[in-house]
Amino acid sequence: MITLTHYLVLGALLFGISAMGIFMNRKNVLVLLMSIELMLLAVNFNFIAFSQHLGDTAGQIFVFFVLTVAAAESAIGLAIMVLVYRNRQTINVADLDELKG
């Protein structure tokens, strides 16, 4: 039988993988965005696991709000990334150190 501990371990593994993705690859904006999204999904997975374990639907409802914000974040982040790529021909974070007013 799968218990709450199994779900929490899986959520922690997903969170750890996404944290490794952020810390090991700080150069590519696309990989950073994907790692942040994976981190949010790991947190949502834990919300759903606790919600199911406690028999309360509040955690599941909260997940819908988090997914909505994550979708908006992804859309805005990808739009900014496309604009930066059109102007600079790169999505390398190290090359994005100049601000123009």
Swiss-Prot record:
GO biological process per UniProt: ATP synthesis coupled electron transport
GO cellular component: NADH dehydrogenase complex; plasma membrane
Pfam family name, one: Oxidored_q2
Main localization of the protein described in the UniProt heading: membrane
Keywords noted in UniProt: Cell inner membrane, Cell membrane, Membrane, NAD, Quinone, Translocase, Transmembrane, Transmembrane helix, Transport, Ubiquinone
InterPro entries xrefs: NADH_UbQ_OxRdtase_chain4L/K (IPR001133), NUOK/Mnh_C1-like (IPR039428)
Location in the cell: Cell inner membrane
Topology term for the membrane: Multi-pass membrane protein
Record keyword Membrane present: yes
GO molecular function, a single term: NADH:ubiquinone reductase (non-electrogenic) activity
Catalytic activity: a quinone + NADH + 5 H(+)(in) = a quinol + NAD(+) + 4 H(+)(out)
Transmembrane segments: 4-24, 30-50, 61-81
Enzyme Commission numbers on file: 7.1.1.-
Subunit structure: NDH-1 is composed of 14 different subunits. Subunits NuoA, H, J, K, L, M, N constitute the membrane sector of the complex.
Function description: NDH-1 shuttles electrons from NADH, via FMN and iron-sulfur (Fe-S) centers, to quinones in the respiratory chain. The immediate electron acceptor for the enzyme in this species is believed to be ubiquinone. Couples the redox reaction to proton translocation (for every two electrons transferred, four hydrogen ions are translocated across the cytoplasmic membrane), and thus conserves the redox energy in a proton gradient.
Family: Belongs to the complex I subunit 4L family.
Official protein name in the record: NADH-quinone oxidoreductase subunit K
Annotated source species: Neisseria gonorrhoeae (strain ATCC 700825 / FA 1090)
